[in-house]
Each structure stands twice: as C-alpha cells, then as structure tokens.
C-alpha cells in the first residue's frame, strides 16, 4: 500500500483535481496568486457574419417549412397535411416502380458495388443516361456528355461554382424560382440578376427583359421546365426564343428538367437540348421526381453541346475536376440505373401522372372557389401551383409567411410561402398527395380564410 505524505503527495493529488492553491487552480481561473487567463480571440469567429450564418436559411425551403411546422398545434385533433413538400413518396399511392426497387436490390445483393465509383459516375450508368436522353433530341449523346450527381441538388452545387470562377460573373435566375440556385450563387459570390415569369401568360419567361438585365459578365441563365414552382410547361417556340437570346448574349442555358416526365396536359415536354446547336445547354435531371425516389439521391448533368463550345472553354473539364473532389451517388444505385431506365414500364408513369392529374384538377377547382386566393394559370406539369393571396380581403394577415404560420396553427396545413421563392404574398401548393387529403387540406384553407376575412368583406366565397 502506498502512503501519501502531507507535502508533495497532497499537492500532487490536489493538482490532479484542479484544486491546488497554485498553478493547478489557475487552470480554472481561480488562483489566489495569479490573474485569470486572457480571453482567446478565435479567428474562425469571424464566420458569424458570413452568408451561411446570417442569410442561409432565407434561401431554404426546408428551413422555412420547419419554421412553419413549428406553429402546428401538436395536440390538435386532425392530422397535419403537408402541402408544401415536393416528396410524395410519403404516400403509399406514389410508391416507385417495382422494376426500380428490384434493380437496386439486385445490385446491392451482388456485393460488388459497396466500393467508391469514379467521380463522374460508373461508365455503364452514364451510357444508359446518355441513351435515355438521346431519344428526345436530334443528335446522340455519349457517356462523356453525362456526369452523375447525388441528386439534382448536387448538380446545382457543381454547376454554380464552375460558373463563379470568373471574377465579377453574374447569372440570370427566374422569379419565382427554386431557391437553391440563389443560395448556391450567394455562397460562391456569384451575382444574381432576376428575370420575371409572367403569371397571365402561363408563367412564360419575360424574354424581352433578358437583354436589359444581362451584360458582358453574364455567364448563364436558368430555366425550369416543367416549372417548379408554377406548374407551367414551355412550348417549342418559347424555348427556341430563349435559345436565340442566349446565343445573342453569349451565355449557356442551365435547364432544370427534373420534372420532365410529369406532364399533365396536352402540351408536350420539349428538352432544352433540342436547341443545343443554337446555344450550349447543361441539363439537370434525376430519378427523384419522376420515379418518386428523392431519397435515392441520383441525378445528372447532361451536356447538350454538339458544337463542343463547352469542351473548348473547359466547362466540361471544370465539372469533372469539381466532381473529383466531391461526393458521388451510392455506387449500387448507379449500377442499378441502366435497368431502372430500361425496365420501368410505361404503366408506372401513366399511373403517377393519372394521380397528379386528378389532384391538380381538385386543386385548381378548390382554389377557383375560394375568393381569398387566386390561381392565374392551371398547372400543366410538375407537382406545384403558385397561388396569389388576396390579403386585402383578410384581417390581420400581414404577409405570406404570416398567412402560412397562422394557417398551420389553426388548421394544421403546411404551405410554402412565396417569399422564399421570390414572390411575396404568394404561396406554393403541392398537389402531389392523395386526392382525399388534398381536398381536406384545401377545404381547411378555405375555412381559415373565411374565419379571418375582414369584417366588411362580403359573406360567402
């Protein structure tokens, strides 16, 4: 047995507990004989004033949705109806194709695809996407024209930094639009200039404004077709005009086409790549929306550039180099991709479009019967519609965020405020849900409006 003395042994034991009257206590800033240590100036603390810390949440649908969801009364008697999301996979009726599930399961069970893949994607998967996309354009894409990404979101994350390499560059974004473009541009110090989509013209691009807002530093413009958040589908003639203006301005077109298979009306989906011979196109696509599997995280950037402008200017090289230092989709999902594209039956898409079409009809009808909100254009594609709030008819509703928060609190219905999409005092409604739930949700919106109408408002709706 070891005995400790009352001298050095006690001091050592006390120091071990940070209780010494000497230097050990100074560690706690409590020494009787020494001043407390000076505060450290942490160099990384300057980041508190950065874009991510100060304004990042303003450009996030997810963040604003969480904020609104916090207004819901958890003990309420009715289920929460999520009409703000773009993920109908939560509803069993929107389950993906069995062929897609089988392809992923088979790839996983081989045990051969638990490894890393090349940064740009597996060759067979790239070739399959190229073959799939070539069906809609007058020339053939190769595997080298396709870069696989972790969903459409990473495709945006890849393209924006590539365009931001030039000092002082700017990009043209639609208003309303998808806020991830705005956020990524801000993070990469790429200036944003907006062009409007015109509600009364089916949310067409205000083409006449493009030349006035662009300059020699403009590198690209973004179009979303079929459109999120408006539900529009652009015609061949309209897209041709966009391509001609892009050529005149010397810019490339970023075509967000993740909803390309979700067309509800008679107007067909025209890939922007059809006009790649006029102006180069980077098309963003994914399995997420058309196959209803956003959690699988598989998307792509496809290069439509038959004149090889993007190759000569090293845009394609820059994309490759970015992906080589970034993440990539799960390798087994990449391996499954050729079979998913080849084996998914037309009946699956027919079923999904049938559900969306039925729900879009309900959505449009219910909105038309509610005088407190206005829908300027019936949705033709995607899974969304933009709706104007007639706030002058409502009492104590200050703006779109106030409307959405109070609606969530009183009716347990979640909508997406238009301000996060670039249009204040509008809301985005998703109709990608079970028709009965959508009907219930829109009836709750109507009840909320009637309950909060101005006292001098005419009764009824």
Curated annotation (Swiss-Prot):
InterPro entries, per database record: Aminotransferase_I/II_large (IPR004839), PyrdxlP-dep_Trfase (IPR015424), PyrdxlP-dep_Trfase_major (IPR015421), PyrdxlP-dep_Trfase_small (IPR015422), TyrNic_aminoTrfase (IPR005958)
Summed up, the tissue specificity of this protein is:
Expressed in roots, but not in leaves.
- Could you list this entry's UniProt keywords, alphabetically sorted: Aminotransferase, Pyridoxal phosphate, Transferase
Q: Taxonomy-wise, where does this protein's organism fall, top ranks first?
A: Eukaryota, Viridiplantae, Streptophyta, Embryophyta, Tracheophyta
> Which residues are reported to carry the modification N6-(pyridoxal phosphate)lysine?
289
According to the UniProt entry, which residue ranges have a biased composition of type Low complexity? Answer: 11-29
What conditions trigger expression of this protein? By iron deficiency. No expression is detected when sufficient iron is present.
Function, as annotated, reads: Involved in biosynthesis of mugineic acid family phytosiderophores.
Catalytic reaction annotation: nicotianamine + 2-oxoglutarate = 3''-deamino-3''-oxonicotianamine + L-glutamate
Family per UniProt? Belongs to the class-I pyridoxal-phosphate-dependent aminotransferase family.
Q: What is this protein called?
A: Nicotianamine aminotransferase A
GO BP terms: namely: biosynthetic process; tyrosine catabolic process
Which cofactors does the annotated protein need, by name?
pyridoxal 5'-phosphate
> Which residue intervals make up region (Disordered)?
1-29
Which GO terms fall under molecular function for this chain's record? Answer: L-tyrosine-2-oxoglutarate transaminase activity; nicotianamine aminotransferase activity; pyridoxal phosphate binding
Q: What is its EC number?
A: 2.6.1.80
